[in-house]
């Protein structure tokens, strides 16, 4: 219901407005005070010895940050860098922090996005709610540039480049601060970032258009790849920030979806519940992010659909050129 108020102008907003409006004012006041404390030095912020790129957003929920992080990491690797990725591991609880993700890491310990980023890129990934501690660990392990998955509002970590990802369809909803609206910070915050990347929809002036291009479906058990429309009677589910985006992609690919089910972002799936859902069709299709949580109890008819961020060559060059400029300021070189 809350997202209907934020993004769909649901009539119930008139009932909840008197309750939520004061809370939004309080949220905004606290956020401004905390940010100002870091800016004037009343609160300490960590300056890393290597460049830091923050990929975040100003709204709650999933906007497509992780594909951007993966794209950045892969490009940096191609350029000879050794990137390290920082995440707070939302929804997870590690036995010790900072936690360095590896092939044996459980998503319940590190989080689904960190595990996905590690599996896709093989990069160094460290999880810690206190992000500067994760950065320090990655530097110890040899990283020479940092990419943070989320953390735009984590001002305890200084950054050199800020990238904001915007949902091109939903944009900023009713443009109110949490909890009345989806905003973590006012839209005026966008005036001070390096790049605004628009995921789908129409990019506004000054924004970079991004599309998420689906690949072939991959079998969770065997790694076999097929086109989605080769799979009959699909049960589709997604536990991401905005599940309808995934279902829309399947529709555009001509997938034979008989059942679709959305779950909360970062939800820890119950194997029995997923198995029961799977019995409603002949095959199961899920997002790659969900696959990292389902692999341990997957069946041989379960598939996931990987997607990759795509930009125009001009926009790619703009982003990479800015990174190169920052690296030169540090006097750094590729590994």
Swiss-Prot record:
Role of this protein: Transfers the gamma-phosphate of ATP to the 4'-position of a tetraacyldisaccharide 1-phosphate intermediate (termed DS-1-P) to form tetraacyldisaccharide 1,4'-bis-phosphate (lipid IVA).
Pathway where this protein functions: Glycolipid biosynthesis; lipid IV(A) biosynthesis; lipid IV(A) from (3R)-3-hydroxytetradecanoyl-[acyl-carrier-protein] and UDP-N-acetyl-alpha-D-glucosamine: step 6/6
Signal peptide: none
Originating organism: Vibrio vulnificus (strain CMCP6)
EC class of the enzyme, as a word: transferase
GO biological process per UniProt: lipid A biosynthetic process; lipopolysaccharide core region biosynthetic process
Amino-acid positions noted as binding ATP in the UniProt annotation, renumbered to this chain: 59-66
Record keyword Magnesium present: no
Protein name: Tetraacyldisaccharide 4'-kinase
Reactions catalysed, as given in the entry: a lipid A disaccharide + ATP = a lipid IVA + ADP + H(+)
EC number: 2.7.1.130
GO MF term list: ATP binding; tetraacyldisaccharide 4'-kinase activity
UniProt similarity note: Belongs to the LpxK family.
Keywords of this entry: ATP-binding, Kinase, Lipid A biosynthesis, Lipid biosynthesis, Lipid metabolism, Nucleotide-binding, Transferase
């Amino acid at each position: 219901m809350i997202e209907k108020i934020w993004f769909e102008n649901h009539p119930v907003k008139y009932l909840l407005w008197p309750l939520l409006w004061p809370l939004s004012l309080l949220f905004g006041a606290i956020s401004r005070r905390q940010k100002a404390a870091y800016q004037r030095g009343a609160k300490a912020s960590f300056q890393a010895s290597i460049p830091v790129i923050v990929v975040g957003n100003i709204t709650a929920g999933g906007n497509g940050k992780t594909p951007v992080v993966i794209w950045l990491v892969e490009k940096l690797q191609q350029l000879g860098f050794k990137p390290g990725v920082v995440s707070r591991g939302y929804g997870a609880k590690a036995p010790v922090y900072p936690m360095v993700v590896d092939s044996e890491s459980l998503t319940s310990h590190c989080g689904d996005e960190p595990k996905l980023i590690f599996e896709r890129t093989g990069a160094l990934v460290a999880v810690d709610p206190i992000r500067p501690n994760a950065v320090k660990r990655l530097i110890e392990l040899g990283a020479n540039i940092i990419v943070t998955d989320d953390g735009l509002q984590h001002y305890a970590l200084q950054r050199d480049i800020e990238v904001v990802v915007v949902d091109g369809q939903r944009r900023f909803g009713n443009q109110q601060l949490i909890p009345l609206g989806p905003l973590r910070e006012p839209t005026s915050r966008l005036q001070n970032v390096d790049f605004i990347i628009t995921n789908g929809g129409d990019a506004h002036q000054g924004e970079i258009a991004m599309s998420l291009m689906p690949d072939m479906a991959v079998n969770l058990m065997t790694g076999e790849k097929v086109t989605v429309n080769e799979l009959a009677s699909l049960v589709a589910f997604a536990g991401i920030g905005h599940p309808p985006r995934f279902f829309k992609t399947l529709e555009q690919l001509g997938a034979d979806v008989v059942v679709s089910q959305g779950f909360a972002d970062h939800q820890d799936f119950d194997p029995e519940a997923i198995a029961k859902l799977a019995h409603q069709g002949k095959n199961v299709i899920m997002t790659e992010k969900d696959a990292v949580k389902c692999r341990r109890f997957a069946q041989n008819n379960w598939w996931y659909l990987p997607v990759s961020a795509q930009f125009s060559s001009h926009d790619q060059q703009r982003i990479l050129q800015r990174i190169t400029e920052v690296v030169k300021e540090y006097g750094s070189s590729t590994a």
